[in-house]
Regions:
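A conditional alpha-helix N-cap/helix-loop micro-motif detector
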Residues: 7, 69-73, 185
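Conserved SAM/SAH-binding loop
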Residues: 8-13
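Short, conserved active-site loop motifs that form the nucleotide-linked donor/cofactor pocket
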Residues: 3-4
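Class I S-adenosyl-L-methionine
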Residues: 17-24, 35-48, 81, 96, ...
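SAM-dependent methyltransferase catalytic-core segment centered on the flexible catalytic loop
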Residues: 18-95
Length: 271
């Protein structure tokens, strides 16, 4: 099987694709904002000016599954429990899920995650130097952050921090390379690379259940991880293969790291 594949299918059909279980499930969940997606964003109006009238984005969802009918959280966790690799006997090797989500979704996600066998969670807050809520700037404090929740079963997940502290509250990591924007809520590749590098090793499997443009797969490919994604919208899948897939550049340092570790295992450094 190829190392990087974006399936034009629902993650609920994962069995038919015969993919391996994941060390890390990394997904940007639908925030279920519906027609309020662009509510405080200048794009609501033509040219960002309300005197010009509403634009085509007014009262429009980012995509037609961004509501509670189009995306069911209990079903999502039911399938994720099967997609993530089983709890290992040893320590420091357990898998985990990292889900980008809205702050308002925290309690609902934690509830259904616990029911699916993931009672433990760690929140992340990513600080931005800007806010998309420009229209509310003279009315109230505006949001300049994004959130994520890390879920795990019992044992703490694999953690490769290279001896450095990883803060739960950190700066939003921007791309230094200009990547094509294919999806309205596309996350920076550099941020995804940081998370993948921290919670997986070379050749581990990363799965994105709601892949959108496929930047998770691009980030995983750059780091020599195997990655599989699911996306039901054909235009996003086509955009990934046409524009992002050709940009994957495997990191030679990661390959050397893997070769060194393999040799150390042969010599008995790891039990």
């Amino acid at each position: 099987m190829d190392r990087i594949i974006l399936f034009n299918d629902s993650f609920q059909n994962w069995k038919s694709h015969q993919i391996p279980c994941a060390q890390l499930i990394l997904t940007d969940l639908p925030y279920q904002l519906g027609d309020k997606m662009y509510g405080s964003n200048p794009v609501w109006y033509e040219g960002g000016d309300n005197s010009n009238g509403e634009s085509k984005f007014a009262h429009k969802a980012a995509f037609d599954t961004d509501d509670k009918r189009g995306f069911r959280i209990p079903e999502f966790f039911h399938f994720c429990a099967k997609l993530l690799k089983p709890e290992p006997k040893g320590t420091k090797e357990a898998g985990c899920m990292i889900l980008f989500c809205a702050l308002e979704q925290f309690e609902e996600l934690k509830h259904y995650a616990a029911l699916a066998g993931f009672p433990n969670s760690i929140p992340f807050i990513f600080r931005k130097s800007y806010s998309a809520q420009v229209l509310k700037a003279n009315m109230r404090p505006v949001g300049n952050y994004e959130c994520a929740l890390l879920f795990y079963r019992d044992k703490l997940p694999k953690f490769r921090n290279d001896g450095r502290m990883v803060f739960q509250n950190m700066d939003w990591i921007q791309d230094t390379v200009k990547y094509p924007k294919i999806h309205p809520t596309q996350k920076p590749v550099a941020l995804l690379e940081f998370l993948i590098k921290t919670f997986t090793d070379v050749d581990d499997v990363v799965i994105d259940c709601c892949a959108g443009s496929g930047t998770t797969l691009l980030a995983a490919g750059n780091l020599n991880r195997k990655a599989y994604g699911f996306e039901i919208k054909k235009e996003f899948v086509k955009g990934f293969y046409d524009q992002l897939f050709p940009l994957i550049q495997p990191d030679m340092f990661s390959q050397e790291e893997k070769a060194t570790k393999d040799e150390q295992i042969k010599q008995g450094y790891f039990l």
